[in-house]
Amino acid sequence: ADEEVEIVQRRVESLGRALQLPAEKPPLEEIRRVVTIFRELRSGVTADGKMKIKTPSSTLSTAEAISVINQGLSLAAHFGDGRMRASDVASGLVGAVVKDPVQDRVAWLEYLATVMKERSGWKDLYRSCREVTQ
């Protein structure tokens, strides 16, 4: 779990330097949340193993997690105050998960309602994802 988070963090930081993004380093917590969401949706079960969830058709690879975080950093740098927040990550997250507008949307909405909404400290990400999923 933490190995994937570290890979995403390292790649995002090196890409940010290469692109000279005028943004702060992405908060580790945002990277951790994206990696957790991808992992849970890939495996069809929550991290604690307590709940089975529908899996979308998308691959949700580590490379896609890097892309979602990079997109969030770019939004924060160019349209925000340089600090990446949940709202900066939400559209990339939804775009990565929902490839098929019917099947994937059902899996995503179920994940939002049953997992993300109930998770402690994830209300900001839940709200942002709900907004862009409409």
Report residues per predicted region.
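Charged, alpha-helix-enriched surfaces in structured cytosolic catalytic cores
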Residues: D2-I7, K25-R33, T55-S67, Q71, ...
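Generic serine detector
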Residues: S14, S43, S57-S61, S67, ...
